[in-house]
Every structure is written in C-alpha cells, then in structure tokens.
Amino acid sequence: MKRHEAREKALQALFQIDVGHIPPDEAIGNVTGSGEVDPFLRQLVFDVIEHRAEIDELLRSNLEKWKLERVANVDRVILRMATYEMKYVDDVPVSVSLDEAVELAKKFGDWKSGSFVNGVLSKVKAALQK
C-alpha cells in the first residue's frame, strides 16, 4: 500500500474512532477489510491516538478564531494526522505531510477545507521550526 492510500485509510479509521467512538482495531478492519494491515496505516492510527493531547494542544495554539472542537470532524482528523507526521515522523518531510493533508482535505472535506487546513498547518510548521 502506498503512503497516500495509507493516509486515506487512516483518515477514514480515525474519523470512525472520533465520531463513532469505536475501537481502533475495529475501525482499521472496517476500512481495510480482512487483509493485512499496512504498518504505516497502523502507525498513523495508533500514534495519533497516543499523542492526541500534545497534537491537540499544538493545534489549539495555532487556530485563530476557532476552537478545535468546532472544526469540522474530517478537517480535525486531517489536522491531527498531519500534525502528528510533522512532529513525530522523521522520514517524511514536513512539506510532504502538509501537501498530503491539503489533498486529503480537498478530497474529503468541503470546498474551504483545503485552504483552511493549509493555513493551520503552515502555522504549525512555523511553530515546530522555532
């Protein structure tokens, strides 16, 4: 599985976990079927959950005029995934994480999601480089 596809599946699984409050393994199974689970997909899902408090704090400090809880569910999940990658995944360049997140937002979010995600993650990127 390519990383782009793993990100899409992770987004779908994390969305189910966030909105439907289902266990991570069940959510991953829902999006992958009964096949073997890609290690990057599994890493994204479980590590975003594990680091959620730190990720959310970083997002809150970079959201202007928004509360994280008021951000659209799909956008919030995309922001969490990308922030996790930018902060914790060393083998993925920050610019790749940001670009992938914008593409996911354009595909799965509404017409404003791409620019919103880009704006927030650009601030997160700057904060992480300090």
UniProtKB/Swiss-Prot annotation:
Gene Ontology cellular-component terms listed: cytosol
Record GO biological process: DNA-templated transcription termination; transcription antitermination
Highest taxon in the source lineage: Bacteria
CDD domains membership: Terminator_NusB
MF-aspect GO terms: RNA binding
The keyword Disulfide bond appears for this protein: no
Keyword entries, A-Z: RNA-binding, Transcription, Transcription antitermination, Transcription regulation
Family to which this protein belongs: Belongs to the NusB family.
Alphabetized HAMAP family for the sequence: NusB
Function of the molecule: Involved in transcription antitermination. Required for transcription of ribosomal RNA (rRNA) genes. Binds specifically to the boxA antiterminator sequence of the ribosomal RNA (rrn) operons.
Alphabetical list of NCBIfam families matching this protein: nusB
Name of the protein in its database record: Transcription antitermination protein NusB
UniProt source species: Geobacillus thermodenitrificans (strain NG80-2)
